[in-house]
Amino acid sequence: MNVNNVEMVMSAVSAAQYPTDGKPEIALVGRSNVGKSSLTNTLIQRKNFARTSSQPGKTQTLNFYDVENQLYFVDVPGYGYAKVSKKQREAFGNMIEEYITSRKQLRGVISLVDARHDPSEDDVAMYEWLHYYNIPILVVATKSDKISKSKFNKYENNIKKQLGFDSSASDFLFFSSETKYGRDSVWEWITAHM
Protein backbone atom coordinates (compact mmCIF):
# COMPACT_ATOMS: atom_id res chain seq x y z
CA MET A 1 0.00 0.00 0.00
CA ASN A 2 1.24 3.46 -0.84
CA VAL A 3 0.79 5.50 2.33
CA ASN A 4 0.57 9.28 2.25
CA ASN A 5 -2.05 10.03 4.91
CA VAL A 6 -1.84 8.71 8.45
CA GLU A 7 -3.34 10.20 11.57
CA MET A 8 -3.35 9.06 15.16
CA VAL A 9 -7.02 9.60 15.87
CA MET A 10 -7.36 8.46 19.45
CA SER A 11 -6.08 6.65 22.47
CA ALA A 12 -8.72 4.48 24.10
CA VAL A 13 -9.06 2.45 27.28
CA SER A 14 -12.62 1.16 26.78
CA ALA A 15 -15.12 0.25 24.07
CA ALA A 16 -17.00 3.52 24.54
CA GLN A 17 -13.94 5.33 23.17
CA TYR A 18 -13.30 3.17 20.07
CA PRO A 19 -13.83 4.64 16.59
CA THR A 20 -17.39 4.24 15.32
CA ASP A 21 -16.86 4.54 11.56
CA GLY A 22 -16.60 0.78 10.93
CA LYS A 23 -13.19 0.72 9.19
CA PRO A 24 -11.28 -2.58 9.41
CA GLU A 25 -8.69 -2.80 12.18
CA ILE A 26 -5.39 -4.64 12.47
CA ALA A 27 -4.01 -4.89 16.00
CA LEU A 28 -0.32 -5.11 16.86
CA VAL A 29 0.57 -7.09 19.97
CA GLY A 30 3.82 -8.15 21.58
CA ARG A 31 5.92 -7.75 24.65
CA SER A 32 7.30 -4.37 25.61
CA ASN A 33 10.08 -3.10 23.32
CA VAL A 34 9.62 -5.82 20.69
CA GLY A 35 9.16 -3.19 17.98
CA LYS A 36 5.44 -2.48 17.53
CA SER A 37 5.96 1.26 17.06
CA SER A 38 8.96 0.65 14.78
CA LEU A 39 6.87 -1.73 12.65
CA THR A 40 4.12 0.89 12.42
CA ASN A 41 6.60 3.60 11.43
CA THR A 42 8.16 1.37 8.77
CA LEU A 43 4.81 0.33 7.31
CA ILE A 44 3.63 3.91 6.98
CA GLN A 45 7.08 5.16 5.94
CA ARG A 46 7.36 7.74 8.69
CA LYS A 47 10.35 7.89 10.98
CA ASN A 48 8.81 8.90 14.30
CA PHE A 49 5.06 8.87 13.79
CA ALA A 50 4.34 6.14 16.33
CA ARG A 51 6.38 7.03 19.37
CA THR A 52 9.21 4.60 20.00
CA SER A 53 10.85 4.39 23.38
CA SER A 54 13.78 2.62 24.94
CA GLN A 55 11.71 2.64 28.12
CA PRO A 56 9.47 -0.45 28.21
CA GLY A 57 5.81 -0.08 29.08
CA LYS A 58 5.38 3.36 27.46
CA THR A 59 2.18 2.52 25.54
CA GLN A 60 -0.65 2.26 28.08
CA THR A 61 -3.70 2.74 25.87
CA LEU A 62 -5.06 1.31 22.62
CA ASN A 63 -3.71 3.77 20.05
CA PHE A 64 -5.74 3.96 16.83
CA TYR A 65 -3.89 5.10 13.69
CA ASP A 66 -6.07 5.91 10.66
CA VAL A 67 -4.18 4.78 7.55
CA GLU A 68 -5.29 6.35 4.26
CA ASN A 69 -8.86 6.56 5.61
CA GLN A 70 -9.10 2.81 4.83
CA LEU A 71 -8.13 1.02 8.03
CA TYR A 72 -6.83 1.42 11.55
CA PHE A 73 -3.63 0.09 13.03
CA VAL A 74 -4.26 -0.47 16.71
CA ASP A 75 -1.13 -0.37 18.85
CA VAL A 76 -1.79 -2.44 21.96
CA PRO A 77 0.15 -1.99 25.25
CA GLY A 78 3.15 -4.28 25.46
CA TYR A 79 2.93 -7.20 27.83
CA GLY A 80 5.49 -8.80 30.09
CA TYR A 81 6.98 -5.62 31.51
CA ALA A 82 7.82 -6.31 35.16
CA LYS A 83 8.00 -2.72 36.44
CA VAL A 84 4.31 -1.94 36.14
CA SER A 85 2.13 -2.83 39.11
CA LYS A 86 0.10 -6.02 39.21
CA LYS A 87 -3.06 -3.91 39.23
CA GLN A 88 -1.89 -2.05 36.11
CA ARG A 89 -1.02 -5.34 34.35
CA GLU A 90 -4.51 -6.64 35.14
CA ALA A 91 -6.08 -3.44 33.79
CA PHE A 92 -4.03 -3.76 30.56
CA GLY A 93 -5.06 -7.41 30.30
CA ASN A 94 -8.75 -6.61 30.73
CA MET A 95 -8.57 -3.75 28.22
CA ILE A 96 -6.83 -5.95 25.62
CA GLU A 97 -9.19 -8.88 26.21
CA GLU A 98 -12.27 -6.68 25.85
CA TYR A 99 -10.95 -5.22 22.61
CA ILE A 100 -9.82 -8.47 20.97
CA THR A 101 -12.81 -10.61 21.95
CA SER A 102 -15.56 -8.10 21.20
CA ARG A 103 -14.38 -5.84 18.39
CA LYS A 104 -16.20 -6.74 15.16
CA GLN A 105 -13.94 -4.47 13.08
CA LEU A 106 -10.84 -6.44 14.11
CA ARG A 107 -9.68 -8.32 10.98
CA GLY A 108 -6.44 -9.75 12.27
CA VAL A 109 -3.61 -9.46 14.74
CA ILE A 110 0.07 -9.00 14.03
CA SER A 111 1.84 -10.72 16.90
CA LEU A 112 5.45 -9.56 17.20
CA VAL A 113 8.25 -11.68 18.63
CA ASP A 114 11.97 -10.96 18.76
CA ALA A 115 13.62 -13.07 16.04
CA ARG A 116 16.77 -13.52 18.15
CA HIS A 117 15.14 -15.13 21.16
CA ASP A 118 12.75 -17.91 22.08
CA PRO A 119 9.18 -16.64 22.45
CA SER A 120 8.39 -15.77 26.06
CA GLU A 121 5.64 -17.47 28.06
CA ASP A 122 3.55 -14.35 27.40
CA ASP A 123 4.19 -14.65 23.64
CA VAL A 124 3.05 -18.28 23.70
CA ALA A 125 -0.01 -17.46 25.83
CA MET A 126 -1.00 -14.60 23.50
CA TYR A 127 -0.62 -16.81 20.41
CA GLU A 128 -2.69 -19.60 21.99
CA TRP A 129 -5.34 -17.13 23.13
CA LEU A 130 -5.68 -15.50 19.69
CA HIS A 131 -5.79 -18.94 18.08
CA TYR A 132 -8.52 -20.03 20.52
CA TYR A 133 -10.66 -17.07 19.41
CA ASN A 134 -10.06 -17.89 15.71
CA ILE A 135 -8.47 -14.53 15.02
CA PRO A 136 -6.22 -14.44 11.95
CA ILE A 137 -2.63 -14.13 13.17
CA LEU A 138 0.53 -12.95 11.46
CA VAL A 139 3.56 -13.74 13.58
CA VAL A 140 6.25 -11.19 12.75
CA ALA A 141 9.78 -11.95 13.93
CA THR A 142 11.29 -8.49 14.42
CA LYS A 143 14.92 -7.39 14.49
CA SER A 144 15.75 -9.95 11.80
CA ASP A 145 18.65 -7.79 10.62
CA LYS A 146 20.45 -8.99 13.75
CA ILE A 147 20.59 -12.60 12.50
CA SER A 148 22.09 -14.10 9.36
CA LYS A 149 19.61 -14.85 6.57
CA SER A 150 21.24 -18.27 6.26
CA LYS A 151 19.88 -19.01 9.76
CA PHE A 152 16.32 -17.83 9.10
CA ASN A 153 14.99 -21.39 8.71
CA LYS A 154 16.52 -22.45 12.03
CA TYR A 155 15.08 -19.45 13.88
CA GLU A 156 11.69 -19.75 12.16
CA ASN A 157 11.40 -23.44 13.02
CA ASN A 158 12.33 -22.75 16.64
CA ILE A 159 9.84 -19.90 17.03
CA LYS A 160 7.05 -21.92 15.43
CA LYS A 161 7.79 -24.94 17.61
CA GLN A 162 7.79 -22.84 20.80
CA LEU A 163 4.49 -21.17 19.85
CA GLY A 164 2.75 -24.39 18.78
CA PHE A 165 2.29 -22.66 15.42
CA ASP A 166 -0.71 -23.72 13.31
CA SER A 167 0.08 -22.96 9.66
CA SER A 168 -3.54 -23.50 8.66
CA ALA A 169 -4.62 -20.52 10.78
CA SER A 170 -1.51 -18.35 10.99
CA ASP A 171 1.24 -16.84 8.88
CA PHE A 172 4.88 -16.08 9.69
CA LEU A 173 7.29 -13.41 8.42
CA PHE A 174 10.69 -12.01 9.31
CA PHE A 175 10.88 -8.22 9.56
CA SER A 176 13.46 -5.49 10.12
CA SER A 177 12.67 -1.83 10.66
CA GLU A 178 16.36 -1.08 10.00
CA THR A 179 16.50 -2.61 6.51
CA LYS A 180 12.73 -2.61 5.74
CA TYR A 181 12.99 -6.36 5.13
CA GLY A 182 9.49 -7.88 5.12
CA ARG A 183 7.62 -4.56 4.80
CA ASP A 184 5.88 -5.45 1.53
CA SER A 185 4.97 -8.94 2.77
CA VAL A 186 3.38 -7.52 5.92
CA TRP A 187 1.34 -5.13 3.75
CA GLU A 188 0.22 -8.04 1.54
CA TRP A 189 -1.07 -9.86 4.63
CA ILE A 190 -2.85 -6.74 5.90
CA THR A 191 -4.46 -6.05 2.52
CA ALA A 192 -5.64 -9.65 2.27
CA HIS A 193 -7.36 -9.32 5.66
CA MET A 194 -9.11 -5.99 5.09
From Swiss-Prot:
GTP binds at residues 30-37, 57-61, 75-78, 142-145, 175-177. GO terms for cellular component: cytosol. One of its GO terms (biological process) is division septum assembly. Residues 22-194 form the EngB-type G domain. Keywords: Cell cycle, Cell division, GTP-binding, Magnesium, Metal-binding, Nucleotide-binding, Septation. Belongs to the TRAFAC class TrmE-Era-EngA-EngB-Septin-like GTPase superfamily. EngB GTPase family. This is Probable GTP-binding protein EngB. Its cofactor is Mg(2+). Necessary for normal cell division and for the maintenance of normal septation. One of its GO terms (molecular function) is GTP binding. Gene3D superfamilies: P-loop containing nucleotide triphosphate hydrolases. Mg(2+) binds at residues 37, 59.
